[in-house]
A protein has these predicted regions:
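Alpha-helical transmembrane segments within multi-pass membrane transporters and channels
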Residues: 21, 54-97, 104, 237-242
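Helix-loop-helix "hairpin" substructures at the membrane interface of multi-pass membrane proteins
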Residues: 127, 131-208, 234-237
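Inter-helical junctions in multi-pass inner-membrane proteins, predominant
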Residues: 1-13, 132, 153-158, 185-224, ...
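Transmembrane helix-bundle core of multi-pass membrane transporters
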Residues: 81-156, 183, 248, 253, ...
Length: 280
């Protein structure tokens, strides 16, 4: 049962990342390979503030606007100039940015492992016999609330409806008078908030190191592919399922194979969809 609880916690972290990733993927039309590094950058900014004696959750709030500015700046400096570029160009550009951010993190924070100063971590013993820490309870509650608010935002607000319109057909949205760059801006902010949250929660639940960006991206991308690009429901289900699979696999496999589970999920999902496409 402990593996099940751990899987739900990890799944919630993946859900935060995959939800932000799939929103931007659907809106901009390409998988941003730098998203894992943005998650990690937000976590390291939070770590820097936390190291000054600021409580970790307050540090997270302070790191959010900095991470948002970084995400928007990257888009304005690079991707805005490539809006009409082909898919391979956009992917290569995002790969270059991911390498730059990874190098930046290594230069500023070094190559070692870092831990957040969370303080005492009280534990709760559940009726099923598993143990969950208070920070893990917060991670689950935060993730549920964030995803619920995002669902309401996309379904009930004008900005959310405009976001769906731009994601469906950017040309028609322009003809209808929707300011697509404004929509991109606000969704970058949302994506950055989800990214920094997921990165920080992973650091709280385990640790941080400069190579974690790719390890973050793999499960996030796998959950997005599994749940269908652009589908928040799919990102939610895919993230939870992948988190549970990764943790339950630790019963039989070494924890070193966890990133391989995400990669395997991507390959299997693409294979199944290709077979179904050919049959259809």
């Amino acid at each position: 049962m402990q593996y099940l609880v751990n899987g739900i916690v990890v799944g919630c972290i993946i859900v935060l990342g995959s939800t932000g990733f799939t929103i931007l993927y659907a809106l901009l039309g390409f998988p941003n390979l730098a998203y894992g590094e943005i998650m990690l950058l937000g976590a390291y900014i939070t770590l820097a503030i936390n190291s000054l004696g600021v409580p970790v959750y307050a540090a997270l709030l302070l790191a959010v606007p900095v991470t948002c500015m970084a995400a928007v700046s990257i888009d304005r400096l690079v991707f805005k100039r490539l809006r009409q570029a082909n898919l391979s160009t956009l992917i290569m550009a995002s790969f270059g940015i991911s390498l730059f951010l990874r190098s930046l993190i290594r230069v500023v924070w070094g190559t070692g492992v870092h831990l957040f100063a969370v303080g005492p971590t009280p534990q709760l013993t559940l009726s099923i016999g598993a143990v969950i820490t208070i920070p893990q309870v917060f991670i689950v509650a935060y993730s549920v609330l964030a995803v619920a608010l995002l669902f309401l935002f996309r379904q009930k607000t004008r900005l959310g409806k405009a976001t769906r319109a731009v994601a469906d057909n950017r040309t028609l949205a322009l003809v209808a008078g929707i300011d697509t760059e404004r929509i991109v801006f606000w969704n970058l902010v949302i994506g950055a908030v989800l990214a920094v949250s997921g990165g920080v929660f992973l650091g709280i639940d385990s640790s941080l190191n400069p190579l974690q960006g790719w390890r973050l991206l793999l499960p996030v991308y796998a959950a997005t592919i599994f749940g269908r690009v652009g589908s928040m429901y799919g990102a939610l289900c895919g993230g939870l399922l992948l988190g549970l699979t990764q943790e339950l696999s630790a019963i039989y496999l070494s924890t070193e194979y966890k990133p391989g589970i995400a990669l395997f999920a991507i390959i299997v999902t693409i294979f199944i969809r290709f077979r179904l496409f050919r049959k259809g």
